[in-house]
Each structure stands twice: as C-alpha cells, then as structure tokens.
C-alpha cells in the first residue's frame, strides 16, 4: 500500500472545503511526492501530515494499527519512568520477571545520594502463581526487601498479569505497611489499561498525591522555594538548572522526581511555585497540587539558550523581588557572554543542516528553538504517544512543509529517513541503530544518554554532541558506499 496524500483525501480527512483549502500553494509539491513514495498500511495514511497554513494534525491518540510493529511503551512503563528516580525508594514490580527486566534503570537518572533506586526488584510470578494467586508472594517480598534495605518507601507496581488474576494490590500493601512501618504504595499500572503510556504517568502522579505529597513538613520554609516538576535528572540535567536558580536567590526544594527522596517529595506541598519541565508527564500533578494546596504553576523549557533565559526570568518575575530580577539579568548576561564564541564555532559547520526528531511529545517541539539557535532546520518531527494538543504545539513551532508523524513503525522510519535524508536524527535508543544503518547520524536525547543537555552549559554539550555526530568523516564514506 502506498500513502495517498492527494488533495481530495486531505480535504476529506481535515474537513476543509474548497474555499479554505490552499495547502499546495504554500508547500512545494516535492514534499507531497516524498510522502507518496512511502509504503505503509492504508490505515497509516492519516497519522502523517505536512505542516502548512491549515490546522491539520496527524490522526493520533488511538490504538496502534493492527499489523504494524509499534514502538510504544505500556501503562506500567509510563508509571515506572515517573517514579523510578526517587532515589531512596524500592521499586517492586509485581509480575513476571520480564516486566522488571525491561524497565530496570529505564530513566538513566543520576543521584547525589542514595542509589537504592538503581536496583531492580520483582515478585517473579510463575504459572502456579497465576493459578493460585500472587498475594502471599507479594506480601513476603515486601517484608523481605524492607528487612534488607530499610527504604524510604516501597512502590509496588501492578502489571498485566496481576490485573488478569485479580490480586488485591491495595489490601496487600496496606497489610505490609502495618507489619513493617514503611510506606508501601500501590501503583495500579496494569499495562493493558490504555494504549497510551501517558495513562501510566497519571497513575504515578496519583500514587504520589494519595500516599506521599503532603504527609511531611519541610525542615525549613523558604520564601522563594520552588519545585521543578517533570524533571527526572537524566544524565544529570537537573544539576545544570539548580545552580542557576540558587544564584538568583531561589530555593529549589525538590525536583519531582529527579534526584529526589521520599521526604522531599512528601514535603513538596509547602513550596511557593511549581515549574513544569515535562508537561506530558506532569501537567496533571501540577494542576492537582494547585487544586489541593494552592500552589501555582507554569511551564518552562531548559533546552536552548533562549528557552532557558525565559524560564529563569519567568520565576524572577513571578516572585517580583527587584533584587532577584536584577541578579537574574546579570546572571543571564554573564552566562550567554561566556558561551557565544563556542556556539559560533559550532554554527559554522551546522548552519543549514536538516534535522529529524522522533522522541517524546514534549521534546518533539521543545527542541525547535534550540536547533534554531544552531541555524539548523527541522524537516520531520514525530512521537509515539502524542495527543492532539502535542501535535498542535509541534505544528505551531515548526516551519511550513515539516512532516509530522504519529506512532511510526521501524519500517516507516527507515523509509522516511531514506526519503528525507536529514543530516541527523534526534531520538532514543530504539531508533539509534536503524538510523545509523541508514547512514544517518544520530543523537540520543532520551533516557539512555550520558550527557546533560539542560541549561546554558547543557546547550553547549548538546551542540558539541550534534556537531560531533554530523561532522564525523565516516558518514561521507558510508553514503558513497550506499549509492
């Protein structure tokens, strides 16, 4: 099957009439010709579109198309990535060993203190447990890990199998908490609850709201204290943000959940402001904390110089302290001045280069400004689990003619890369090797990366990694061999 993106089809899908449909006037026909050459299942036509003057977005937030191999994660995986960075907690997976194995250290989060979260724990359900139930095994497992590790809390994750056999997770956790005196927190994250792992993010946030946040008081209250929500300290990202706010005179009480502890999250309700780095995973949490504790929130973005600057200024303006505002402007001026020369060197080689992004919904549009500062052009942007509002953000940030795609399979991505020939693909580890095998340089921006990309210094690190990937001589040789 070949993608059919002719004018009539687009009119039918978007609901546009002849008077307001003028997409082809704005976008070169060559863009549509590229898409028409991509082989795909017929049901996969509408999850791809080209940004233009109309308001069309890909069909999204639906079950994956039968017959294609999706790269999506499950609800359990969505819950796991939100809670795992709590450093002094045990994360116990109630299910088969494979569920724990495939999510072990899934976030790549770093810690300044406890490393307990780096361990993987599972009840390792077997066939007999499926027949007779796994509640006793779960109870004994909780008692054992508490005796061995004395954690700040034990998060117990439900998986698909547990949902099918009907183990009462909440009852077992309640009994185990009474027996141990340790917080034992059920996370009802059966993987089959939704096709979108974002449901798992919400379940993880509910677990924190119901059992952790608001249960302790901070050691001291600061007049300018904030929580950074949706920041998971991947590769140490958080450590490029906190020092900036400290220089402004702002106290970062905790990130939720990067490099956090149970006690810090428990006392987060006393902070004066929540700033949200990843709205996909944490908008819900910020909204609920506002509703329950009266903590206002707004979105920030620490990827790129301009976005980092806006995020610092927004916090200073929120508190309205004149001295803080003055310090913030001096800090911004100093930080950018120190980086201009190095950025210019990278721009010389990267200017005009093209980029494809296939990553989380937030990063798929949040990186647009950062690449603009390197004078690079985004020609494709997509995600596995985007919702309509995510694709509207992408559409609003990218240039006309940019391909926007939802839930692409490996086959489709390979064809898109070969057809569009970007100078680099920004994605996660799942797409890394298909990109490299296609002769396309790759930059890992997801959980497996080892370099911090947030804040001013993080942007320099990012520019360096992108520059190294694009300018490596092997690509000139490999492309000649592939022709």
Swiss-Prot record:
The Swiss-Prot or TrEMBL record annotates one GO molecular function as:
nitrogenase activity
The pathway to which it is assigned is: Cofactor biosynthesis; Fe-Mo cofactor biosynthesis
- Region Disordered, annotated ranges: 1-20
Any single biological process term in GO: protein-containing complex assembly
Stretches of the chain forming a coiled coil according to its record: none
* Pfam families, alphabetized: Oxidored_nitro (PF00148)
PROSITE patterns on file? NITROGENASE_1_1 (PS00699), NITROGENASE_1_2 (PS00090)
Which keywords appear in this protein's UniProt record, sorted alphabetically? Answer: Nitrogen fixation
Q: Which InterPro entries match?
A: Nase/OxRdtase_comp1, Nase_comp1_CS, NifE, NifE-like
Q: Which family does it belong to?
A: Belongs to the NifD/NifK/NifE/NifN family.
| Function noted in UniProt | This protein may play a role in the biosynthesis of the prosthetic group of nitrogenase (FeMo cofactor).
- Please report the name of this protein according to its UniProt entry: Nitrogenase iron-molybdenum cofactor biosynthesis protein NifE
What organism is this sequence from?
Methanococcus maripaludis (Methanococcus deltae)
């Amino acid at each position: 099957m070949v993608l059919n993106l002719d004018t009539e089809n687009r009119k039918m899908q978007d609901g546009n009439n002849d008077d307001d449909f003028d997409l082809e006037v704005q976008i070169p026909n060559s863009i549509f010709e590229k898409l028409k050459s991509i082989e795909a299942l017929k049901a996969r036509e509408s999850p791809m579109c080209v940004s233009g003057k109309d308001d069309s977005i890909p069909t999204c937030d639906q079950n994956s198309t039968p017959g294609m191999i999706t790269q999506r994660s499950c609800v359990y995986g969505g819950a796991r990535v939100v809670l795992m960075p709590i450093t002094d907690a045990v994360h116990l997976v109630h299910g088969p060993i494979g569920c724990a194995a495939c999510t072990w250290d899934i976030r790549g989060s770093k810690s300044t203190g406890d490393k307990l979260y780096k361990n993987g724990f599972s009840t390792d359900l077997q066939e007999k447990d499926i027949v007779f139930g796994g509640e006793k095994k779960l109870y004994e497992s909780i008692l054992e890990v508490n005796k061995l590790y004395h954690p700040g809390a034990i998060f117990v994750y439900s998986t698909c199998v547990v949902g099918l056999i009907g183990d009462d997770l909440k009852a077992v956790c309640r009994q185990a908490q009474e027996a141990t005196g340790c917080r034992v927190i059920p996370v009802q994250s059966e993987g089959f609850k939704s096709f979108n792992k974002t449901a798992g993010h919400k379940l993880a946030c509910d677990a924190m709201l119901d059992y952790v946040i608001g249960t302790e008081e901070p050691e001291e209250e600061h007049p300018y204290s904030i929580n950074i929500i949706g920041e998971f300290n991947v590769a140490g990202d958080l450590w490029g943000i906190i020092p900036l706010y400290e220089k402004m005179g702002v106290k970062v009480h905790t990130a939720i959940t990067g490099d956090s502890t149970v006690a810090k999250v428990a006392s987060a309700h006393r902070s004066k402001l929540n700033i949200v780095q990843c709205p996909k995973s944490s908008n819900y949490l910020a909204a609920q904390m506002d509703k329950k504790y009266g903590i206002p929130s707004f979105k920030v973005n620490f990827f790129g110089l301009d976005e980092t600057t806006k995020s610092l200024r927004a916090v200073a303006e929120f508190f309205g302290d004149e001295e803080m505002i003055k310090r913030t402007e001096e800090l911004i001026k100093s930080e950018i001045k120190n980086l201009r020369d190095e950025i210019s060197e990278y721009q010389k080689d990267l200017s005009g280069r093209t980029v494809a992004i296939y990553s989380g919904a937030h990063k798929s549009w949040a990186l647009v400004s950062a690449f603009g500062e390197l004078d690079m052009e985004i020609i494709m942007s997509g995600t596995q689990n985007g919702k309509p509002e995510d694709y509207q953000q992408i559409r609003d940030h990218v240039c006309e003619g940019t391909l926007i795609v939802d839930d692409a399979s490996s086959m489709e991505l390979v064809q898109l890369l070969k057809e569009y020939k970007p100078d680099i693909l920004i994605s996660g580890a799942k797409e890394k090797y298909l990109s490299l095998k296609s002769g396309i340089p790759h930059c890992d921006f997801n959980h497996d990366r080892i370099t911090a990309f947030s804040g001013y210094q993080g942007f320099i690190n990012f520019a360096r990694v992108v520059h190294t990937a694009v300018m490596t001589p092997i690509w000139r040789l490999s492309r000649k061999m592939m022709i």
